[in-house]
Amino acid sequence: KVVCACKDFTANGKILYDFCSIKNTILDSEHGGTGTELSDIMESMEKQQFVNPNTLKQHFWNMFVVDAFLGNFDRHNGNWGFLFDSATQNAEIAPVFDCGSCLLPQADDKVMERVLQDEDELNARIFQFPTSAVKDQGRKIHYYDFLMSKKSEDCNKALMRIVPRIHMDEIQNFLQEVPYLSDLQHTFYQTYIQ
C-alpha cells in the first residue's frame, strides 16, 4: 500500500494537543471532546486560550474548505490542534496532518473504473459524499450544500482566501508525477480533483 509520511512537527520539545483534548476541558457536553457538532466546535474555539480565537476560527474554516476540495470525510477533533512549546510556554496552531481520508482512499480499481465511466457516479462522489465529520444540528455536513448555502460568513471568507490559492495545473502535474500509481489511479485522481 502506498503511504505518505510527513515531517515530525513535535520535534524540539513541542507537544501536540489535539482539539479533542482541549474541547474536553472547555465544554460540558455528553460527547466531551469527541463531539463534532459545529456549534460546540465554534464555542470551544471562542473559549480556548491557546491562540487567538479569531485566528483559530480562520484556520478551522481554511481547513474545512480544503477538506471539502479533497473530499476528506475524517477531519474530527483528534486530528487537528495545537503545538505547545514547553520551553517558551507558547502555543501555535499545528500544521494540518492526517489527511489519509482524502481522495476516496477506499476506492479500488472497480470503483475507479465505474466512477470514470459514469458521470452520475462521479457527481455522487462530489455532491453527495463524502460528507464532513463535522455535524450541523446532528447531521454530517454535506460539503457542497454547506458551501453553496453561504450560511457561514467565516466559511465564505475562507472560500475567498483558499480558492485563489488552488492552482489546478500544479495539482494535476503533482498527481501525474506520484510514483507507484497505476495509469487508472492517475486518471481517477486527476478526474476527481478537477
Region spans (language model):
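Internal, well-ordered alpha-helical scaffold/interface segments
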Residues: 58, 62, 78, 91-97
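Anionic group-transfer/hydrolysis microenvironments
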Residues: 9, 69, 81, 97-100
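ATP-dependent phospho-/nucleotidyl transfer catalytic cores
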Residues: 9-65, 69, 87, 149, ...
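C-terminal catalytic region of ATP-dependent kinase domains
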Residues: 83-194
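A conserved loop-to-beta-strand element in the N-lobe of protein kinase catalytic cores
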Residues: 2-7
